[in-house]
């Protein structure tokens, strides 16, 4: 009887740990992975020897305007819709992470620069269909070999995204 109790106790503990991990790595608003997940995956992705890889950065436009003029719940609804759009247009071999309030990172493996560029253009077009002229600034960076680090690619994609944001204004 004591052995049975220990087995059940161990299984329950494993379930609790899984639930804690799920909450630790999941964004509560969008149900996407969060920054904690990104930080946990970075070294694994750095060790990946499959190329090309790409980082896509997405920054939603006009969130502050929507929050100020329509309320934070409307801003949250738009972020949820944008996250759903990202999931619905997600490519195979990719992960979508909400890194900040209105920013997302997409990590992709096995796509050419041309394919990533086409994907980003499609995302930009789709984001414009969201309410309140929401839109998004999107930038990307390719990792062709082990010389460029993920941090370098994230920085390059962020700069590309910032340039796209300037073009939006």
Each model region followed by its residue ranges:
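Short beta-strand-to-loop capping motifs
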Residues: 106-111, 142-144
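Conserved long alpha-helical elements within nucleotide-processing catalytic cores of c-di-GMP signaling
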Residues: 21-25, 34-54, 61-87, 97-106, ...
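Catalytic-core segments of nucleotide cyclases and related cyclic-nucleotide turnover enzymes
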Residues: 117-124, 128, 142-169
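Alpha-helical transmembrane signal-anchor helices
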Residues: 1-16
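Membrane-proximal helical linkers
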Residues: 13-27
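Short catalytic/binding micro-motifs of nucleotide second-messenger systems
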Residues: 88-93, 119-133
């Amino acid at each position: 009887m004591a052995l049975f109790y220990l087995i059940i106790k161990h299984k329950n503990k494993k379930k609790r740990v899984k639930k804690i991990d799920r909450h630790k790595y999941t964004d509560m608003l969008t149900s996407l992975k969060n920054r904690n997940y990104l930080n946990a995956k970075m070294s694994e992705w750095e060790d990946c020897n499959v190329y090309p890889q790409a980082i896509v950065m997405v920054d939603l436009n006009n969130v502050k305007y929507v929050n100020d003029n329509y309320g934070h719940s409307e801003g949250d609804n738009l972020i949820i819709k944008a996250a759903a759009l990202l999931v619905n247009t997600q490519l195979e071999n990719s992960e979508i992470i909400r890194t900040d309030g209105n920013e997302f990172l997409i990590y992709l493996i096995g796509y050419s620069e041309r394919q990533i560029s086409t994907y980003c253009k499609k995302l930009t077009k789709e984001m414009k269909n969201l309410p309140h002229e929401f839109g998004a600034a999107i930038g990307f960076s390719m990792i062709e070999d082990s010389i460029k680090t993920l941090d370098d690619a994230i920085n390059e994609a962020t700069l590309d995204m910032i340039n796209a944001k300037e073009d939006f204004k």
